[in-house]
């Protein structure tokens, strides 16, 4: 199974890139984690946020590989513990499809992305900076993988 992380924003701070890549490289080949960056729309004091969200959403959905299971990262989503996320990963594997996880920009995801999602995952009730979410998602997925494979990374 391939995990596809589709995120808005292309010029991340170095610590975000290093943090994401640290977990990305730990995944085995049979569960590769791929990052696809979508250019963020230009935001200014008079920006049309609805139009920007719409365009970002179109680009995100165009990046989803055909037939993938889509998971949006969104506040109304389901909170998963590490064991519950590990269980979700097992279900995704048994489903036989690759998984695309969608991370929006500063204003979140477009309505089209939310509607296209098969599932919605809420990392926290806190508002998190969208660059940091990349690192948290990569680590959480790696930890869930380690639970499923009895790797010593996760300890209870």
Swiss-Prot record:
GO MF annotations in UniProt? rRNA (pseudouridine-N3-)-methyltransferase activity
Supply the InterPro entries for this chain. Alpha/beta_knot_MTases, RlmH-like, tRNA_m1G_MTases_N
Main localization, broad class: cytoplasm
What is this protein for, i.e. what is its function? Answer: Specifically methylates the pseudouridine at position 1915 (m3Psi1915) in 23S rRNA.
Q: How does it assemble?
A: Homodimer.
**NCBIfam families in alphabetical order:** PRK00103.1-1, PRK00103.1-4, tRNA_RlmH_YbeA
Q: Can you say what this protein is called? A: Ribosomal RNA large subunit methyltransferase H
